[in-house]
């Protein structure tokens, strides 16, 4: 009989740019170690491992051309370095207060599990679980769309005083706007 607890479990985070320091990676690692009792591998994908605790496995970002939250789309590469089995992705600002074992044990046969945003009709991308290598079309379709259909627009958000990158699909009417990775991942999964 197959025991799901024997399957490879990976917890992956991504650190890019300067928004979150290495300390966020170190804290997330500590919370995962305290709250995940299943055997697992913790990996941080990053372009700069400075300050990340030496016990944390770091691997380089593969697609440095992906910007802002779209950096997450490289999680769907096949292969994603040597990572195999289930991947639980966690944003660096995630706070873990209780056991996260069930994030791996709930519906182990499911190829993708994500949390639905309560205020929008798409999946949240701060926490989701999927099988490594099973969804390369998420990034492949993104690459095709960016090259052939999208225009970029930088929008200033007065509330955060940040400039955000948005992509407009010029082939849809009205033009669809992808404000971040969450909307694109949801669209790609729904289209399949």
Tell where the protein language model's regions lie, with residue ranges.
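Glycosyltransferase catalytic domains, chiefly GT-A lineage
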Residues: 2-192
């Amino acid at each position: 009989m197959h025991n799901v607890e024997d399957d490879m479990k990976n917890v992956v985070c991504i650190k890019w740019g300067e928004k979150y320091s290495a300390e966020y990676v170190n804290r997330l690692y500590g919370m995962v170690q305290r709250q995940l009792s299943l055997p697992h591998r913790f990996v941080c994908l990053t372009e700069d491992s400075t300050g990340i605790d030496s016990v944390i496995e770091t691997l380089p970002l593969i697609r440095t051309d992906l910007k802002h939250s779209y950096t997450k789309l490289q999680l769907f590469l096949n292969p994603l370095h040597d990572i195999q089995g289930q991947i639980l992705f966690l944003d660096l600002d995630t706070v873990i207060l209780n056991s996260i074992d069930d994030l791996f044990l709930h519906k182990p046969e499911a190829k993708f599990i994500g949390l639905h945003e309560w205020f929008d009709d798409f999946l949240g991308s701060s926490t989701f679980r999927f099988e490594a290598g099973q969804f390369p079309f998420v990034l492949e379709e993104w690459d095709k769309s960016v090259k052939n259909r999208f225009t970029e627009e930088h929008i200033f958000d007065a509330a955060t005083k940040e400039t955000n990158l948005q992509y407009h699909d010029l082939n849809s009417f009205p033009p669809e706007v992808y404000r971040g990775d969450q909307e694109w991942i949801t669209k790609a999964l729904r289209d399949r």
